[in-house]
Curated annotation (Swiss-Prot):
Name by which UniProt lists this protein: Fructan 1-exohydrolase
Source lineage: Eukaryota, Viridiplantae, Streptophyta, Embryophyta, Tracheophyta
One Pfam short name: Glyco_hydro_32N
Catalytic activity: Hydrolysis of terminal, non-reducing (2->1)-linked beta-D-fructofuranose residues in fructans
Glycosylated residues (UniProt): N166, N234, N246, N565
Length: 600
C-alpha cells in the first residue's frame, strides 16, 4: 500500500462559498427569444451545433437528463398501468432557465427512459408565464390528474389542473387543461401572490374529502397551505395551514407522505393509513431539501412535528449536497415510496451554453422511516443494479494511518462502489462539539481529509488524476458525545477540478450511530462522470455532488482509492465495485430497448 498523502495537503479556500439557487441575469443580446419579457432569462444557445467536448465529457451515462437544454424540478412522477412517468421542468429553447414547460418521459424500470413531447405548454392565460412544478394524483377508478402552478398573465402564481386526453393511450402523451383553470388563486387575506406554488399529491381525509398542500407565504410566515375538495376541481382553503414556521424563507416544493417505523416499504396516501404511522413533511428552502417527522392530527387537520425545532439549520435534510426540489411518489408496482431531486450545474452559465444542456435528476431512491422513527433513510432503487458489470471484490483489507489502496479494473469514471469500514477500536474517538451541527459543511472544510483524527478520516478518493492535483474525497470521521457516537460524512470537492470558476464546497452531514452495537459503517458511491451520489451509514446521510475534473477528458486516467488517515486502524471486510453500463435516457430507439434489459 502506497504512502501517498502529499496529495491531501490542506487546501486554501479563497473567498466564501454561498449556496445559491438564484439564477444569473443575462443582458439583452441577439440570442434573446423576443417573447415579450416573459422568460426569466432570454439568452439561448445556438441550435443544431455539434456537441462540444464539454457536452460529452460531463454528460452522465445513467442519470435522468433531457437530451438537450435546461431542466430542473421533477414534477408529478407516477406509476400508471405498468409504466413509470417522469415529468420535469424543461426549457424547449435552450440550456438556461426560462420558457418552462412540462417535459415528459416514460420507463418500465426507472433507469431507461423514452422522451415524449411536452405534456404541458404555456398556452393559456393561467400559465402563459410558465408551467411550473406540481404533482400527479390518481383518483378513484384509475384517473390520473395533474395539478400544477402556472404563472398567469399578471405574473401571479395560480394552480391549474389537467387530465389525460385519452386514458387508453398507455403513454398518456396528451393532456387537456380544465376549463375552470385556475382552480386556486392567491386572493385571500395575508397571501403573497408571487409566493404560492408547487401543490402536493392529494390525499383523502377521514371525512372523505380530498386534501392537498401548496407552498406559500401567509402573513409573513412560511407555510404549507391546506386545501379541501369534494371533486378535485373545486377547492376551499382551510382556515389554518397544514404547518407553518416564522423563521424561514418561503417553502418551495412541499411533500407530505406517510411512513411506518420498521417498514421499508411505502404507504399509499389514497388508502387508509395504518395505526402507528408517522408523516414526513418535506420542504425546499435555503437551497436544500429539509424535513420534519411527526404525526398527522386528524382532528386538527394539521401536521404536528415530534420535535419543534425553531432553528431551521437543525432540521434534517434529504440530501446534504447539490440536491433540491425533490418529489416523491408511491410506487404501487413494488409497494415502495420513491424520491428523486434536481441536481443543478455548479459550473457557469457560459459553460451550460457551450454544453447545450443543464441539470439532471438524481438516481431514484427508496425512502423509508428508520426503525427508531427519528429520520428517513434512502437507498438507490434496486433497478440501478441491472447496469452493473465487471465486478471486482476485495476482502480482509486493513488500512493503517496514511494507507491508500487503489481500486483497479473498473471504469472509475462510471462506477458503483460499496465498501464496509470496520472499526478496530472505538476508544480513540475525538470529542464532539454540538455546535458543529449548525454548519457541518463548515466543519468538513475545517478538518478536511488531510487532518488526522482519532477515528478517521477514512473513505474513498475518486476521480483522481495521476498526480492527485484533481481528486474528490468522500469520507467519515467518528466523534463521541457522552455515551453516543456521531459520524461526520463529507464530500469534499475543493480539489475536484483545477478550474477556478466552479463551486467547489466541502459538503457534509452528521448522523448518530450505535458503534457500541455495530462497528461497521457502510459507504456506497455512484460515480457518473460529473455526478457523484454517496450514501453513508445505510442511507442515513446522502450527498449529491457535481464535479468537473479535466481527468474526464481522458477517462482511463481517473484513479480511485480507499484510504485511512486516522490514528485508529480501519478494516475493510468487504469492498465491491462495478463498472456501470450506459442507460438509455431520453434517446428515441423504440420500446424494445427498454423492455429488454439485455439491450441497454
Amino acid at each position: 500500500m502506497a504512502q501517498a498523502w502529499a496529495f491531501l495537503l490542506p487546501v486554501l479556500f479563497f473567498g466564501s462559498y454561498v449556496t445559491n439557487l438564484f439564477l444569473p441575469t443575462y443582458a439583452s443580446s441577439p440570442l434573446c427569444s423576443g417573447d415579450g419579457g416573459r422568460s426569466f432569462l432570454c439568452a439561448q444557445a445556438p441550435k443544431d451545433k455539434d456537441p462540444s467536448p464539454a457536452s460529452t465529457m460531463y454528460k452522465t451515462a445513467f442519470h435522468f437528463q433531457s437530451a438537450k437544454n435546461w431542466m430542473n424540478d421533477p414534477s408529478g412522477p407516477m406509476y400508471f398501468n405498468g409504466i413509470y412517468h417522469e415529468f420535469y421542468q424543461y426549457n424547449l429553447n435552450g440550456p438556461i432557465f426560462g420558457d418552462i414547460v412540462w417535459g415528459h418521459s416514460v420507463s418500465t424500470d426507472l433507469i431507461n427512459w423514452i422522451g415524449l413531447g411536452p405534456a404541458l405548454v404555456r398556452d393559456t392565460s393561467s400559465d402563459i408565464d410558465g408551467c411550473w412544478t406540481g404533482s400527479v394524483t390518481i383518483l378513484p377508478g384509475g384517473k390520473p390528474v395533474i395539478i400544477y402552478t402556472g404563472g398567469d398573465i399578471d405574473q401571479h402564481q395560480v394552480q391549474n389542473i389537467a387530465f389525460p386526453k385519452n386514458r387508453s393511450d398507455p403513454y398518456l402523451r396528451e393532456w387537456i387543461k380544465a376549463a375552470n383553470n385556475p382552480v386556486l388563486r392567491p386572493d385571500e387575506p395575508g397571501m403573497n401572490s408571487i409566493e404560492f406554488r408547487d401543490p402536493t399529491t392529494g390525499w383523502i381525509g377521514p371525512d372523505g374529502l380530498w386534501r392537498m398542500a401548496v407552498g406559500g407565504e401567509l402573513n409573513g410566515y412560511s407555510a404549507a397551505l391546506l386545501y379541501k375538495s369534494e371533486d378535485f376541481l373545486n377547492w376551499t382553503k382551510v382556515d389554518h395551514p397544514l404547518y407553518s414556521h416564522n423563521g424561514s424563507n418561503m417553502w418551495e416544493c412541499p411533500d407530505f407522505f406517510a411512513v411506518l417505523p420498521g417498514n421499508n416499504g411505502g404507504l399509499d396516501l389514497s388508502a387508509a393509513i395504518p395505526q402507528g404511522a408517522k408523516h414526513a413533511l418535506k420542504m425546499s428552502v435555503d437551497s436544500v431539501d429539509k424535513y420534519l417527522i411527526g404525526v398527522y392530527d386528524l382532528k386538527r387537520d394539521a401536521f404536528v412535528p415530534d420535535n419543534v425545532i425553531d432553528d431551521r439549520r437543525l432540521w434534517l435534510r434529504i440530501d446534504y449536497g447539490t440536491f433540491y426540489a425533490s418529489k416523491s411518489f408511491f410506487d404501487s408496482n413494488k409497494g415502495r415510496r420513491i424520491i428523486w431531486g434536481w441536481s443543478r450545474e455548479t459550473d457557469s452559465p457560459s459553460d451550460d451554453l457551450e454544453k447545450g444542456w443543464a441539470g439532471l435528476h438524481t438516481i431514484p431512491r427508496r425512502i423509508w422511516l428508520a426503525d427508531d422513527g427519528k429520520q428517513l433513510l434512502q437507498w438507490p432503487v434496486d433497478e440501478i443494479e441491472f447496469l452493473r458489470t465487471n465486478e471486482i471484490n476485495h476482502q480482509g483489507l486493513e488500512l493503517n494511518k496514511g494507507d491508500l489502496f487503489e481500486i483497479k479494473e473498473v471504469d472509475t469514471f462510471q462506477a458503483d462502489v460499496e465498501i464496509d469500514f470496520e472499526l478496530a477500536s472505538i476508544d480513540d474517538a475525538d470529542p464532539f462539539d454540538p455546535s458543529w451541527l449548525l454548519d457541518p459543511e463548515k466543519h468538513c472544510g475545517e478538518v478536511g481529509a488531510s487532518v488526522p483524527g482519532g477515528i478517521g478520516p477514512f473513505g474513498l478518493v475518486i476521480l483522481a488524476s495521476d498526480n492527485m492535483e484533481e481528486h474528490t474525497e468522500v469520507y467519515f470521521r467518528v466523534y463521541k458525545l457522552q455515551e453516543k457516537y456521531m459520524v461526520l460524512m463529507c464530500s469534499d470537492l475543493r480539489r475536484s477540478s483545477m478550474r477556478p470558476d466552479l463551486e467547489k464546497p466541502a459538503y457534509g452531514g452528521f448522523f448518530e450511530f450505535d458503534l457500541a452495537k455495530e462497528r461497521k459503517i457502510s459507504l456506497r458511491t455512484l460515480i457518473d462522470r460529473s455526478a457523484v451520489e454517496s450514501f453513508g451509514g445505510g442511507g442515513r446521510v446522502c450527498i449529491t455532488s457535481r464535479v468537473y475534473p479535466a481527468v474526464l477528458a481522458d477517462v482511463g486516467r481517473a484513479h480511485m482509492y480507499a484510504f485511512n488517515n486516522g490514528s485508529a486502524t480501519v478494516r475493510v471486510p468487504q469492498l465491491s465495485a462495478w463498472t456501470m453500463r450506459k442507460a438509455q435516457v431520453n434517446v428515441e430507439k423504440g420500446w424494445s430497448a427498454i423492455q429488454n434489459r439485455g439491450s441497454i
